């Protein structure tokens, strides 16, 4: 029925993509399910959003048993692959529904208020909340994607979906579908396989989290494969260091870009265009490599203090936004919705600032600020110089309880293979 929560629980798989589009066409609300999360946490979320249908990959049959037992709202469970033990497969489900009349959702306005997806938040401060993303929100995201991610060159598009489609990569597929682009689906990320696909399948667009982007940069094939088909490598979901941007331009050419958004304002609150990255890497406004780009045309952004006042240009505050990209709120969580929508704005929970040219800079998550000895320390400001050290692959800085200072700063560092660095060396390099 219209508005039913329809969960798709699968690794990257062509049938999973088909199920997402089919659910939307039938009027359901797509619920992406993280295959890396525990069965119990997935069951908790699916029960919360009152899931009616669950489409799953056979490799997850054991976890499905846990979910079914804990989700009383379920009406049907369908396996999207070959599984002799499944009560129903995608083939039998389609045969059974062959003559079912699909409602015509088309109207002159595209039913903008209908819920497209109940997207889980990151759950960093508790159980995930279900973000009610409407058709109107997605149309806005697609329009922004067509403008900033695809542009005028719409012929012969080949998009490689290699990041999990249970996250932003799943929503991006729809942008390419609107212009008849081809999407290749890789079940998981392998840097060598991605580079091979770019060369042999003439991939034009790819979306990657920073860790995968770094793996591509460091792979020996990155400098030997023919990657000339690439038009954009969109890196998002976490900050990218300026040095990694510069290396990306050297290795891949002027195709690397970055965007900023969140489930509550999907994907494109701001966009750091490839030409801006390339220019900044060459020395024209190099500070822009620290930004997440200019605010997009359909979105209004303000930097607010805790009382809802706009702070002066260049000063730090909470990044807040409004416009047709911002979602309706959280499923069955009116208090959480009200808390995020104060002073007439959606509050992202991110601390940042705007410059005079409308470039947006993110400093840190508001809740990730470390207070040590009465001083406010943003984790990203400690992470940045560590990430700039040769041999450092990844870094995360956290605050840990400290009897003297309240909190002390701890850095968790992952080194490139074969690199040896002692903690004292890192501290000596980054300490003021």
Label each residue range with its predicted role.
Residues 7-9, 16, 20, 24-55, ...:
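Short beta-strand->loop structural element characteristic of the AMP-binding/adenylate-forming
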Residues 139-158, 166-205, 219:
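Conserved AMP-binding/adenylation subdomain of ANL enzymes
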Residues 178, 203-208, 217-287, 300, ...:
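Gly/Ser/Thr-rich phosphate-binding loop
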Residues 116-143:
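Conserved AMP-binding A3 loop
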Residues 294-298, 309-339, 375-377:
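Conserved ATP/PPi-binding loop(s) of AMP-dependent carboxylate-activating enzymes
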Residues 8, 16, 37, 54-56, ...:
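AMP-binding/adenylate-forming catalytic core of the ANL superfamily
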Residues 1-2, 25-96, 417-423, 428:
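Structural core segment of the AMP-binding/adenylate-forming
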Residues 79-85, 98-120, 127, 151-158, ...:
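Conserved pre-ATP/AMP-binding loop-to-beta segment of ANL
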């Amino acid at each position: 029925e219209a508005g039913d929560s329809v969960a798709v629980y699968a690794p990257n798989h062509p049938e999973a993509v088909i199920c997402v589009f089919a659910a939307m066409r039938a009027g359901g609300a797509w619920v992406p399910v993280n295959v890396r999360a525990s069965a119990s946490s997935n069951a908790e979320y699916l029960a919360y959003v009152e899931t009616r249908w669950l489409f799953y990959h056979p490799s997850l049959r054991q976890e499905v048993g846990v979910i079914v037992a804990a989700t009383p709202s379920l009406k049907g469970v369908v396996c999207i692959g070959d599984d002799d033990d499944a009560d129903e497969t995608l083939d039998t489900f389609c045969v059974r529904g062959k003559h079912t009349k699909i409602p015509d959702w088309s109207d002159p306005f595209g039913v903008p208020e209908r819920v497209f997806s109940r997207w889980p938040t990151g759950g960093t401060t508790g159980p995930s909340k279900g973000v009610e993303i409407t058709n109107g929100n997605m149309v806005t995201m697609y329009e922004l994607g067509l403008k900033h991610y695809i542009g005028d060159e719409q012929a012969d598009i080949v998009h490689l979906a290699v990041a999990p489609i249970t996250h932003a990569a799943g929503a991006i597929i729809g942008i390419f579908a609107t212009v008849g682009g081809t999407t290749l689906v890789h079940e998981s990320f392998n840097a060598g396989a991605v580079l091979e696909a770019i060369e042999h399948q003439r991939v034009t667009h790819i979306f990657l989290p920073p860790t995968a982007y770094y793996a591509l940069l460091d792979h020996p094939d990155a400098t030997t494969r023919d990657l000339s088909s690439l038009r954009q490598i969109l890196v998002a979901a976490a900050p990218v260091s300026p040095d990694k941007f510069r290396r990306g331009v050297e290795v891949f050419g002027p195709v690397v870009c970055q965007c900023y958004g969140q489930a509550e304002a999907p994907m494109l609150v701001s966009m750091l265009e490839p030409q801006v990255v390339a220019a900044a890497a060459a020395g024209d406004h190099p500070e822009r490599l620290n930004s997440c780009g200019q605010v997009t045309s359909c979105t209004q952004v303000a930097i607010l203090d805790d009382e809802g006042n706009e702070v002066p240009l260049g000063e730090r505050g909470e990044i807040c936004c409004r416009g047709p990209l911002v979602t309706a709120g959280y499923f069955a969580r009116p208090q959480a919705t009200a808390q995020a929508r104060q002073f007439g704005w959606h509050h992202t929970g991110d601390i940042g600032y705007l410059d005079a040219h409308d470039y947006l800079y993110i400093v840190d998550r508001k809740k990730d600020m470390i207070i040590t000895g009465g001083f406010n320390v943003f984790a990203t400001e400690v992470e940045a110089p560590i990430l700039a050290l040769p041999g450092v692959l990844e870094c995360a800085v956290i605050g840990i309880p400290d009897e003297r200072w309240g909190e002390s700063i701890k850095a968790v560092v992952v080194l490139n293979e074969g690199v040896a660095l002692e903690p004292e060396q890192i501290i000596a390099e980054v300490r003021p």
